[in-house]
Amino acid sequence: MKKIFITILLAALMPFAAGAQDARQRTAETIVADALAQLPAQTPKAFASLMQELAATGADGIRMMAAMLVPAAEGKNAPVEYAINGVVSYVTAAGREELAREIRAGLTDAVAASTDKPNQAFLLSQLQLCATAAEAPVYVTYAAHEYLADTAVRGLIAP
C-alpha cells in the first residue's frame, strides 16, 4: 500500500517538476541561433519578442552575433545585421537603460574584435545609435583610421 501511495504521489508531482523547467534557461548561443532562424518575424509583436530575447543575452549575445559577420566577399551579413540593428533599436526605448549599457559594451568589444573594416564600420554605426558620452574614447580610437574615420567622427558628433 505504501509503494502505491508513493508511486501515485510521485506521478502527481511530475507535472510540477516539468513546469519548473522554463525555456528561458537556454544559453545565449541557443537564444541567438533561435532568433536568427526566426527572422524576419511574421508580425511586429513576434519581432519585439525576439528582440527582447536577444537584448536579454546582453554583451555576450552582441559579441556572438558580431562574430558571425563575414567579409562581403565571403557571405551575406543581412540577417545578422538585421538582428543587431533590431536589438539596438529595442534597447534605445525609454526604460531599457540597463539593457542598452550591456549592448554598448558588447558593441564596443565587437568593434575591437572585428578585423573586417566594413563590419567594423557597421558596428560603430550601431554603437552610435545607443552611445553615451562614455563611448567617446571608442570613436577617438578609430578617428584617425582611413576607412573608419568618417563613421568614427559621426559617432563623436552625434547627439
Roles of regions detected by a PLM:
Residues 1-4:
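Positively charged n-region of N-terminal signal peptides that target proteins for export
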